[in-house]
């Protein structure tokens, strides 16, 4: 059982670093969106067992109230590649949660280009933000797995 927890942590860290590297392109909306969907991480590639309410609740909320959030990830080939997903595979998880996102909205919603952070004289501002984001992702996954 302990080896399963260890493997889950390793997989989570690899996925987080992959997604974080993509999100570091400067899109804070994408980072916030992906944080809401952290409970869905174990179900990205396997829907057996079906995703629990802890995954489906945030998924339904995002589909119903924040379509641009999903569109940012759905329209970003780098995010899909980092998660080893195709657009078709990405739609399986919401469907497993009983929601059908209207992906036609994604073609109408302009996904924001990466937002450049304001320049700083010594450059430390951006680095500390990136470190904090990576730490918050990792902390959330570790807490989710062990508690």
Curated annotation (Swiss-Prot):
Keywords: Cell membrane, Disulfide bond, Glycoprotein, GPI-anchor, Lipoprotein, Membrane, Signal. This is Non-specific lipid transfer protein GPI-anchored 9. Its main location: membrane. Disulfide bonds join 33-71, 40-55, 56-97, 69-106. Gene3D superfamilies: Plant lipid-transfer and hydrophobic proteins (1.10.110.10). A lipid is attached at residue 125 (GPI-anchor amidated serine). Glycans are attached at residues 84, 122. Belongs to the plant LTP family. Expressed in ovules. GO terms for cellular component: plasma membrane; side of membrane. Transmembrane segments: none annotated. SMART domains: AAI. The keyword Ribosomal protein does not apply. It is found in: Cell membrane. It comes from the Eukaryota. Residues 1-23 form the signal peptide. Probable lipid transfer protein. It is a lipid-anchor; GPI-anchor. Residues 126-147 form a propeptide.
């Amino acid at each position: 059982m302990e080896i399963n927890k260890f493997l889950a942590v390793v997989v989570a860290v690899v996925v987080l670093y992959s997604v974080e590297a993509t999100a570091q392109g400067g899109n804070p909306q994408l980072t916030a969106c992906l944080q809401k969907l952290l409970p869905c991480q174990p179900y990205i590639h396997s829907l057996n067992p079906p995703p629990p309410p802890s995954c489906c609740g945030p998924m339904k909320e995002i589909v119903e109230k924040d379509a641009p959030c999903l569109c940012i990830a759905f329209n970003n080939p780098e995010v899909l590649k980092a998660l080893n997903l195709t657009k078709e595979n990405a739609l399986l998880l919401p469907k497993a949660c009983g929601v059908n996102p209207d992906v036609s909205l994604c073609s109408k919603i302009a996904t924001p280009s990466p937002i450049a952070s304001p320049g700083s004289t010594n450059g430390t501002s951006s680095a500390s933000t990136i470190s904090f984001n990576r730490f918050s992702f990792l902390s959330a996954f570790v807490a989710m797995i062990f508690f």
